[in-house]
Swiss-Prot record:
Keyword Protein transport belongs to the record: no
Name under which the protein is recorded: Proline--tRNA ligase
The organism of origin for this protein: Bacillus subtilis (strain 168)
Domain notes: Consists of three domains: the N-terminal catalytic domain, the editing domain and the C-terminal anticodon-binding domain.
Reactions listed under catalytic activity: tRNA(Pro) + L-proline + ATP = L-prolyl-tRNA(Pro) + AMP + diphosphate
Family: Belongs to the class-II aminoacyl-tRNA synthetase family. ProS type 1 subfamily.
Gene this chain is encoded by: proS
Main location: cytoplasm
Length: 564
């Protein structure tokens, strides 16, 4: 492609509202342009990268017998109502009405559509297993779109769905998809770590996220420094090691703590450690209230609370709800004397606490010498806190460390979450109707583009891996007015294209400095510069990844490039 005939609007200045390096560089290099908040146009270079990522996806999907199709982005409300998610998905689901007042959603995901489709078309176990996938734009009304393509309101996604007659079949496809995803990201050149994750609004149980390691990642990964264990911090189990105390329980004592509401204030006022305090947090779980206790130096993990209670929605109680339910303000809440309408759940570390400090459910007062087994009615002890750096790894090997990551893919075992709700059944060998077992597998294609840019750049610009680069080669003719340079550049352009290379040819009437700067910014794997030695048949070849430059005869150019 001649650069004079395409659209690559590079920028010299960093856009003021671009936080992430990938966002800055994709804008500066002319890959994307913002239409509105969280919505972008993919310029010619970006779209070629997207197509290369999609081709890798298609090749890996074909290897595991997944079949491509395309479903509608506009989805009727009735289908979502069947699954129940119309009422629980939240404001991220973009809803609209047609001229007749009928309700629709713009597809944030396609479980409902694919389940209803397969329900109507597949009736026998003989047609299972079946894996279908699509690559399509998705829509989510993000509260705060940011980081360019990493968190947008419209994005390109590959989503696959598998249907099975047995758990063994689902497990087999899940493992194949897991390996295919690992291959996809490796081929795209991304440093990705698969981690144990939460299924969230998707439902189901077993799930893994593929996290591209990045300092600007919005997810925290907890990993072992001595093993392969890795999990999203929301799902990382805490390996509880109870240490018996030889301290004798003391009598409960109420103390005056004027305006002392936080753990930090409490430890300073009473001269105790955070480990000796009980943090009590009131949650609303669907239509009931529960009190959750953790040690003062720990934080409540609301995902673990949600999973323990099998709740659809778990939210912190409001200031008014705390007063209404417990008769006191936040900051003085505790487990002693809670009425039976509010169930109390405690983290496993609380069970071993002796003579702890906790709120007295009375303004400006706390209790000392709280022993929950004696003084409170605990419904259940469980792992309810976030893991911390320095905790032992849940697999018993090594210590937990943290890293930041960008989620670029996720695989789920949905089980019968959707098939039972939507009556998607098949007839088994005995002619009995059974709910289909389902798997769901997603890759953020546009997010993957951004993650590659986030991991592959330097101070001069982008550095695209060869597998996804928009072009293989970048030819620069430094002086288009010089007949020798122009003619040699034209010949190389034609010859290298004929050899099967994707070539971007900078034939613009620009200064050499502009061409070099744009070339580094765009970041194609190999640059061929036709300059002052063109009459000698000598060109400069620069490898973008290493920065190494070599002057070489055009007769040896093809052989040299093929080895890179």
């Amino acid at each position: 492609m001649r650069q004079s005939l395409t659209l690559i609007p590079t920028l010299r200045e960093v856009p003021a509202d671009a936080e992430a390096k990938s966002h800055q560089l994709l804008l500066r290099a002319g890959f994307i342009r913002q239409n509105t908040s969280g919505v972008y146009s993919y310029m010619p270079l970006a779209y070629k990268v997207i197509q290369n990522i999609q081709q890798i996806v298609r090749e890996e999907m074909e290897k595991i017998d997944a079949v491509e199709m395309l479903m509608p982005a506009l989805q009727q409300a009735e289908t979502w109502q069947e699954s129940g998610r119309w009422y629980t998905y939240g404001p991220e689901l973009m809803r609209l009405k047609d001229r007749h007042g009928r309700e629709f959603a713009l597809g944030a995901t396609h479980e409902e559509v694919i389940t209803s489709l397969v329900r109507d078309e597949v009736k026998s176990y003989k047609r299972l297993p079946l894996t279908l996938y699509q690559i399509q734009s998705k829509f989510r009304d993000e509260k705060r779109p940011r980081f360019g393509l990493l968190r947008g309101r419209e994005f390109i996604m590959k989503d696959a769905y598998s249907f099975h007659a047995s758990a063994e079949s689902l497990d087999e496809t899940y493992q194949k998809m897991y390996e295919a995803y690992s291959n996809i990201f490796a081929r795209c050149g991304i440093n990705v770590r698969p981690v144990i994750a939460d299924s969230g609004a998707m439902g189901g149980k077993d799930t893994h996220e593929f996290m591209a390691l990045s300092a600007i990642g919005e997810d925290t990964i907890a990993y072992s420094d001595e093993s392969q264990y890795a999990a999203n911090i929301e799902m990382a189990e805490v390996l509880h090691q109870e240490v018996p105390s030889d301290e004798e329980p003391k009598a409960l004592e109420k103390v005056h703590t004027p305006n002392v509401k936080t753990i930090e204030e409490l430890t300073a006022f009473l001269q105790v450690s955070a480990e000796a305090c009980i943090k009590s947090v009131l949650f609303k779980a669907d239509d009931r209230f529960v009190l959750v206790l953790v040690r003062g130096d720990h934080e409540v993990n609301d995902i673990k609370v949600k999973n323990l209670l099998h709740a659809e929605v778990v939210e912190l109680a409001t200031h008014e709800e705390v007063i209404q339910q417990l008769g006191t303000e936040p900051g003085f809440v505790g487990p002693v004397g809670i009425h039976q309408d509010v169930e109390v759940y405690a983290d496993q570390a609380v069970k071993a606490m002796v003579n702890a400090v906790a709120g007295a459910n009375e303004g400006d007062h706390h209790y000392k010498n709280v022993n929950v087994n004696r003084d409170a009615q605990i419904k259940e002890f469980a792992d309810l806190r976030f893991i911390k750096e320095g905790d032992p790894s849940p697999d018993g090997k090594g210590t937990i460390r943290f890293a930041e990551g960008i989620e670029v893919g996720q695989v789920f075992k949905l089980g019968t979450r959707y098939s039972e709700a939507m009556n998607a059944t098949y007839l088994d060998e005995n002619g009995r109707a059974q709910p289909m077992l389902m798997g769901c597998y997603g890759i953020g294609v546009s997010r993957t583009l951004s993650a590659i840019a986030e991991q592959h750049h330097d101070e001069k610009g982008l550095i695209w891996p060869k597998s996804v680069a928009p072009y293989d080669l970048h030819i620069l003719a430094l002086n288009m007015k010089n007949d020798g340079q122009r003619e040699l550049a034209e010949k190389l352009y034609a010859d290298l294209k004929a050899e099967g290379y994707e070539v971007l040819y900078d034939d613009r009437a620009e200064r050499a400095g502009v061409k070099f700067a744009d070339s580094d910014l765009i970041g194609l794997p190999i640059r061929i510069t036709v300059g002052k030695r063109a009459d000698e048949g000598i060109v400069e070849v620069k490898i973008r990844q290493t920065g190494e430059s070599t002057e070489i005869s055009v007769d040896e150019l093809s052989a040299f490039i093929s080895k890179q």
